[in-house]
Structures are given as C-alpha cells and as structure tokens.
Amino acid sequence: MEIKPSHDIDLRSDTVTQPCEGMREAMARAEVGDDVNGDDPTVIRLQEKVSGLLGMEAGLFVPSGTMANAVAIRTHTQPGDELIAE
C-alpha cells in the first residue's frame, strides 16, 4: 500500500507555510516592539495572561523548550558548577 503525503497540512517547519491574506493583514496591523528591551506589547500581554492563569507573580516567554531548559539551569547554578543531565 502506497501512502501519499497530504498537501493540506504540512508541519515540517514554519518556513514552508504560506500565510493567507487574512494572516498577512493581521501581521501588518499588529503592534510591534522590542522584546529584548521588554517593550513588545504582545509579549507583555502573553506573559501577564499566562502567569495569571497559573497563579504566578510573573512570566517569561521563551520560544523553545531548549531555551527554557537553559534558563532553568542557569537560574539554579553558578559559573563553575557541574551538571549531569539526561
């Protein structure tokens, strides 16, 4: 039996997606800011919403699980500490 790939949904990467016209319009209208300086209103609202949902004082958005793990490790260790991770 031959399995043919579906062309309706392609989850390989966000680089192969094509936004529809509505998505492009939403991106053009979106508020923008510099998240590095804590000035992006969208990221600020996301962090506030999620921290509120979880009953936490504050939140920190990171774009990947790998980055979240790195932040956690750096938070709990000092330079020169050793860590064994699986």
Residue spans for each PLM region:
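Pyridoxal 5′-phosphate
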Residues: 2-11
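Glycine-rich helix-loop-beta junction characteristic of Rossmann-like nucleotide cofactor-binding loops
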Residues: 51-53, 74-77
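Conserved PLP-anchoring active-site segment centered on the Schiff-base-forming lysine
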Residues: 75-86
